[in-house]
A protein has these predicted regions:
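Boundary-proximal intrinsically disordered activation/regulatory segments immediately upstream
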Residues: 1-67
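RNA substrate-binding interface of SAM-dependent RNA methyltransferases
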Residues: 2-5, 43, 50, 106-108, ...
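Solvent-exposed alpha-helices and their adjacent loops that cap or buttress functional pockets
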Residues: 29-31, 92-94, 113-117
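Phosphate- and divalent-cation-binding pockets in alpha/beta enzyme and binding domains
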Residues: 47, 67-68, 89, 132
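Short coil/turn connectors at secondary-structure junctions
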Residues: 54, 77, 97, 117-119
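Short loop/helix-cap segments at secondary-structure boundaries that form the rim of catalytic
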Residues: 67-75, 112
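A glycine-rich helix N-cap at a beta->alpha junction
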Residues: 73-92
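Glycine-rich phosphate-binding loops that contact phosphosugars or nucleotide phosphates
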Residues: 101
């Protein structure tokens, strides 16, 4: 079960994974350097956790806890509970989907594994911001 940690200081170092997310270059550097990615919104957080990605932590306002209670119950990661104003201050944007999670990337499959049995393969080059 996740440990619930109430935080009221935007400078708390435990929130580092979520800091200044509007800066695409900073986010991409952080994600690549630390092998993590962020999920935003109840559905995406749920799907990422259910897909087996190791959860580093959760960040959410109190009103979103109930909707993800089953996911939190199945995780050992800390859940940082913050006000919506503090979430916006930390991330740099209004967290309108209510919940964020920091997850560890799993190793990528080899080219051979991707192509094995594939009928169609799509290659997308020069993607600057994968969220778009």
């Amino acid at each position: 079960m996740a440990t619930y940690v109430e935080i009221d200081d935007a400078a708390d170092p435990r929130l580092a994974d979520y800091r200044d997310l509007r800066d695409v270059q900073l986010r991409q550097s952080l994600e690549a350097e630390h092998g993590l990615f962020l999920a935003e919104g109840e559905k995406v957080v749920r799907r990422a956790a259910e897909a087996g990605f190791p959860v580093r932590s959760f960040l959410m306002a109190p009103r979103w806890l109930a909707g993800l209670a089953d996911v939190l119950d199945g995780s050992e990661a800390p859940c940082f509970v913050v006000s919506e104003a503090l979430a916006e201050q930390v991330t740099g944007f209004h967290v309108h989907r209510g919940a964020l999670a920091s997850l560890a990337r799993t190793p990528l499959p080899t080219v051979e594994e991707v192509l094995d049995g594939a009928r169609t393969v799509v290659v997308c080059e020069d993607i600057v911001d994968h969220t778009n």
